[in-house]
Amino acid sequence: MGRGPSIEARKNASDSKRGKIFTKIIRQIGVAARAGGGDPSNNPSLRVVIDKALASNMSKDVIERAIKKAIGEMEGVQYEEVRYEGYAPGGVAVIVDCLTDNRLRTVSDVRHAFSKCGGNMGTEGSVAFMFKRLGVLSYAHAIADEERITEAAIDAGAEDVMVYIEDDEIEVITTPEAFSRVKEEMAALGLMPYHAEITFRADSDIVVDGDTAIQVRKLLDILEDLDDVQDVYSNVDQVTLGKR
């Protein structure tokens, strides 16, 4: 009977994954700080990324250095935001958000991933119309009852509240512009989300199975593992990929 990975091997894999996450977040901090300044109290986008960094256990020193590099107080690489769109097998729509210091390298890597897995890249806007940009705040039922969270969310300006009984979860949906305000107003009432993000969500999902599901999952995994890729969105039904 074969042995599984050693403790050291598992730790190295975990450290590598953590390093990739930190690299992506540091790039996000830089872009947000350059666009809106280094003061998170006056830069909602930066505040959102800092919250994400802290939730990932990034130290405040690392965050501050990333901000200083972005606003010119320290030397650092400059990144720009780029977005690619395309289709995975089965007609699954995919959006790939990147931060890069070399567009040619990034587009080559993304195009190769699509081609390798039987998909194809599209032009700008070819699939984005199938998605909505929104803020999502996730709360556990344990922190408060559904009525209290719903009332607080509506008063704060949320767009919708969705209750998932089986998952013991309540989602508060906002516009991207209202995301930080709603989060802060609810936090002031003692309602802290266990997860918060601004994301794309598809208008409807596509169900895939068999070899198609395998290829779609492979493509999404390859894209998410690319250093320049920040986020990958698709309209595939996650249950069919075994990811929910």
Swiss-Prot record:
Subcellular localization, per the record? Cytoplasm
Q: Which Pfam families match?
A: TACO1_YebC_N, Transcrip_reg
- Keyword annotations: Cytoplasm, DNA-binding, Transcription, Transcription regulation
Molecular function GO terms recorded: DNA binding
Tree of life domain: Bacteria
What InterPro entries does the record point to? Integrase-like_N (IPR017856), TACO1_YebC-like_2nd/3rd_dom (IPR048300), TACO1_YebC_N (IPR049083), Transcrip_reg_TACO1-like (IPR002876), Transcrip_reg_TACO1-like_dom3 (IPR026564), YebC-like (IPR029072)
Q: Name one GO biological process term.
A: regulation of DNA-templated transcription
Entry's family note: Belongs to the TACO1 family.
Per its UniProt record, what PANTHER family does this chain match? TRANSCRIPTIONAL REGULATORY PROTEIN YEBC-RELATED (PTHR12532:SF6), TRANSLATIONAL ACTIVATOR OF CYTOCHROME C OXIDASE 1 (PTHR12532)
How is this protein named in the record? Probable transcriptional regulatory protein PD_0885
Task: Name the species this protein comes from.
Answer: Xylella fastidiosa (strain Temecula1 / ATCC 700964)
